[in-house]
Amino acid sequence: HAPFDHTGGVAELCAALPGVPVYLHPADAALVGGDVFPAVGAETTPYQDGDVVKLGKMDIEVLHTPAHTPGGVTLKVGDVLLTGDTLFQGSMGRTDFEGGSYAEIMASLGRLGRLSGDYHVLPGHMGASTLEQERKTNYYLREAMEG
């Protein structure tokens, strides 16, 4: 998503690896390069909920999980969820940034919590977990699933 802690090295990465695509949800693309978030430093390719991005032999499914920003996504790769700033080990992302929404993060958490099966959860910050562990112990995820 668009905040600098996730996009700050994109220009250097693209310089080192020309032709590597940079994906960004359109809801966050609208926020970059202005007063909210600095420019990403590379051309971006939009992706939407339900899209599947191919990376070698891997299929990466895009789940739109707005919360921290309106274009937040979770990437599902096999039995792994890359949850960005939506779901953390024992917590959730902040919603006090431009475009953040408590109601949206709760809906996004509910969506993740209701996925069938178990997944390894790799957030954008803090430690790794599993979805089953978070279903049992994460107050915010439990509230979202009940709501």
Regions found by a protein language model. Give the residues of each.
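Metallo-beta-lactamase
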Residues: L31-A39, D59-H64, T69-G147
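Histidine-centered active-site/metal-ligand motif
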Residues: H1-H6, H25, H64, H68, ...
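Active-site HxH/HxHxD metal-binding segment of metal-dependent hydrolases
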Residues: A2-G56, Y139-E143
